[in-house]
A protein has these predicted regions:
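Short acidic/glycine-enriched loop/turn segments that link adjacent beta-strands
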Residues: 20-23, 79-83
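Hydrophobic beta-strand segments of well-ordered beta-sheets in folded domains
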Residues: 11, 93-96, 117-126, 150
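Acidic-basic catalytic patches of nuclease active cores, encompassing PD-(D/E)XK
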Residues: 38-80, 89-91
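Active-site beta-strand-loop-beta-strand hairpin of nuclease catalytic cores
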Residues: 80-96, 102-104, 111-117
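Short beta-alpha junction loops
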Residues: 19, 33, 124-131
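Domain-level recognition of nuclease-like catalytic cores that cleave nucleotide substrates
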Residues: 128-159
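Structural motif
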Residues: 75-78, 98-102, 124-128
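Interdomain/boundary linker segments immediately adjacent to catalytic/signaling cores
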Residues: 1-57
């Protein structure tokens, strides 16, 4: 009842994510919800830099890599200016992982990562649209023999 009231008052909004086994519904504050919280002297926290969808899939990817024996660092700084969503390390292997919702500049992200030296690069697309966008970006950036190829995974591979 409370959730429905908050939804109808546009204080929160639902974010529906497809998973291998169905879907997950997450909720986040709207701008109106942030204003309402502040009006009642409740700190809504900082405005997230990333979408709720992106943050959720980064956590899922972290759990997936940890289950496979990797030590995982979130928002790992890379050469130049920026960070990758995940750095997964285990003896003899270092992997950079980018979670892509299809809403960012995938080609720029990919080009930036390719300049860094890692054993493997993985992009995780979170939807069919993101798969398409990632495939196009990978084709545009191309493969360089001295750099590792990009492996494209989907939400079905980690959910």
């Amino acid at each position: 009842a409370i959730k429905d009231s908050l939804l109808s008052a546009v204080i929160i909004e639902a974010v529906v994510l497809a998973t291998r086994s169905g879907q997950v519904v997450l909720y986040q504050l709207t701008d109106l919800g942030r204003q309402a919280a502040l009006a009642h002297q409740i700190d809504p926290g900082p405005v997230p830099r990333e979408s709720l969808e992106h943050r959720w899939w980064v956590v899922q990817a972290r759990h997936d890599f940890e289950k496979k024996g990797y030590e995982v660092t979130l928002e790992h700084p890379i050469q130049g200016n920026g960070a990758v969503d995940l750095l997964a390390v285990r003896p003899g292997e270092t992997i950079v992982v980018e979670v892509e919702t299809g809403k960012s500049d995938i080609k720029a992200n990919l080009s930036h990562i390719k300049r860094s030296q890692y054993d493997k690069m993985i992009m995780i697309a979170t939807s069919p649209e993101a798969v398409s966008a990632c495939q196009k970006a990978i084709e545009k950036v191309g493969h360089h023999p001295e750099l590792p190829a990009v492996e494209l995974l989907t939400w079905l591979d980690i959910s």
